[in-house]
C-alpha cells in the first residue's frame, strides 16, 4: 500500500527520508550514522549481492566480538541462498533454457541429461521484485519431452544437409548417377523412430527436411555436360577449314592461318549454378601422344608459343598470343597467370557462347620439337570463385596452308586409318635403307662398256622414265608405290664419310650430280637412273696402291714437322715420341687403357680396325692430325719391308 501525502510529510519530519530541498551540510552524514545504527539494532536489513556478502563476511570476521552483530545484519544461511534463482516465466516454455544449449563445447548428450540451468539474476533483483521469479526447480516430463523432440529435429536437419552436400560433390566430381541415387535413397528412407521424433508436416523443421530431399532429387535428375563445336556453315571459304568427329567422339580441326573459325560452346548445369556469375576460359595447348590430354590442358606451361617473326609483326595485343577472339557477344579479357588464357564473362543464366577464333601463326613456323606435338583447343567453365565446373576440348588442331586438300589426301582416304597423320619431315626414299635401294645386280667388268648389254639393262628404266601419255605416268606411279612390286627405284649411294678410308685411298671421290628427284606434287614425274657401282679393289690392286704410297712416303716432306719426326720412330719404341710430335702427350692414357703401349701395337690395331683413333676415344678435332702423322709412319714402315 502506497503512503499518502500526510504520511510522507510525517516521514520527512522524522528525517527517515531526506528531502532534497532541506538537506543541510551534515544531514547526509547523520543519515548514514542513523542507517548504521538501525542495521545494528536489526531494524533495517540492507540488500547485498552474493559477492558483496562474501567480501563483507571476510572483512567483518576479522574484527573480534562482532560475530553476533554480523548474524543480526546478514541473518542466517538458510534465509540467504548461495545459489541464485532462475527465471521461469519470463519466456515461453520451449525457450526456457540457457543460452549455451547449442554451445559447441558441450556435447548433446550432456545437454540432454542436464535438466536444470541457472540464470545470472542477482539477489538485489529478487528483493526489489522487478519481475516474477521462481527458485530452482526440475522440469516437468512434458517440458523435457518437448526439448528432446526439438533437439532431435535439429540434429536430423543437420545430417540431411550434410548428406546432400556430400552427394552433390561426389556427383559433380565422378559423374556417377548410381552414387547419387544411393545417397538420396538413404536420406529418404531415414526413419524418425530412431530418434523418437514424430514427423509433423506442419512443423518448420520438417518442411526444411522435405526441401533438402527435394533438392537432392533435383540434383540427381540434372545431368551436366559441355560441348564445343565448329560451325562449318559460317566459314567464308570451305577450303580454309576441315572439321570432323571420329567414332570415339574425338574432334579434329584443320584450319588456315588468318581464317576466322566460328566456335560454339554449349553447356547444361544444375540449378545451384544457374544464376551464378560464370566465366569461360579458352586455352591453346600442345601435348605429346603419350601424355594425358586432361593433364596437358590444365598445365600452365603447355601453351603453344608464336614464332618470333609473327610476334614482331603482330598489331594486336597481346603480341605473343597464338590466337585471338573475334566477334564475341560477351566481354573478354586476357590473362597469363595460369598460362595464356582468354576469359569470357558470362551473364547469369547463359547456356551457350558464340565467338570466332583466328590463329596468327602456323605449324611450319614452330620448332621441330613443337611440330612433333599435337595442338589442342580447350575451354573451361568456371564459377564466380574461379573453380572449374565443366570443360571440353578439340583433341587435334592443325594450322596448315591447305587444310581441306590435306585432310582429303591424308585422312579421308581408305588407307588413312589414323586421323592424327603427320607430314613426313623427309621424303620417303631418303629414309629407306641402303639395302633396299641399291642395285642388287652385278656388272661384269668385261661387258661394262658394251653398248648392247647396257642398253638391255636400261630398257625397263627407259620405258618408265619416258612415258608416252598420262595414263602410263599414273600406272608408273602406282607401280612404284605398290609394296608388292619388284621394281625398286635407283638412287645414288651417299658418299662415304669415313675420313680414314678416304685418306687411305681405298674409296675414290664421288662427283655429286643434281638428280631430278621424283615428287608426287610434280605435274610431270620422271625417274632418272644412274648406272654406277662402288669401286672395290682386289688384293693385287690394293697391294699395288700400298706400294705406290709407300714409295711416295720416302720423299722427305719438309713442309710439315711431324712427318720428319715420325720418319725416325721405330716400331719397338713407345708412344711418347709420336704423341709429342703431334702435341698430344696427354692422350697416352687412352692408348694404355686399350692395351696400346708401343708403335708396333698401334700398327697391329690399325691393321685390324682402320678407325682405331675413333675407337679409343680421340677428340674429333684431332683426328686429322693423328691420321696424317700415323699414315706417314705406316707407309715408311711398309716401304722398309719392300725388297730393294
Curated annotation (Swiss-Prot):
Induction: By DNA damage.
A single GO BP: intrinsic apoptotic signaling pathway in response to DNA damage by p53 class mediator
InterPro entries hit by this protein: CEP-1_C, p53-like_TF_DNA-bd_sf, p53/RUNT-type_TF_DNA-bd_sf, Trans_fact_CEP1_DNA-bd
Record keywords, A-Z: Activator, Apoptosis, DNA-binding, Metal-binding, Nucleus, Transcription, Transcription regulation, Tumor suppressor, Zinc
Assembly behavior: Homodimer. Interacts (via C-terminus domain) with prmt-5; not methylated by prmt-5. Interacts with cbp-1 (via HAT domain); cep-1 transcriptional activity may be inhibited by interaction with methylated cbp-1. Component of a complex that contains prmt-5 and cbp-1. Interacts with ape-1; the interaction inhibits pro-apoptotic activity of cep-1.
GO MF assignments: DNA binding; DNA-binding transcription factor activity; protein homodimerization activity; sequence-specific DNA binding; zinc ion binding
Protein name as catalogued: Transcription factor cep-1
Gene giving rise to this polypeptide: cep-1
Names of required cofactors: Zn(2+)
Tissue expression notes: Expressed in pharyngeal muscle and neurons.
The protein's role, per its UniProt record: Transcriptional activator that binds the same DNA consensus sequence as p53. Has a role in normal development to ensure proper meiotic chromosome segregation. Promotes apoptosis under conditions of cellular and genotoxic stress in response to DNA damage, hypoxia, or starvation. Regulates germline apoptosis in response to DNA damage. Its pro-apoptotic activity is inhibited when bound to ape-1 in vitro. Plays a role in cell cycle arrest in the germline in response to DNA damage by UV-C light.
Subcellular location: Nucleus
Lineage: Eukaryota, Metazoa, Ecdysozoa, Nematoda, Chromadorea
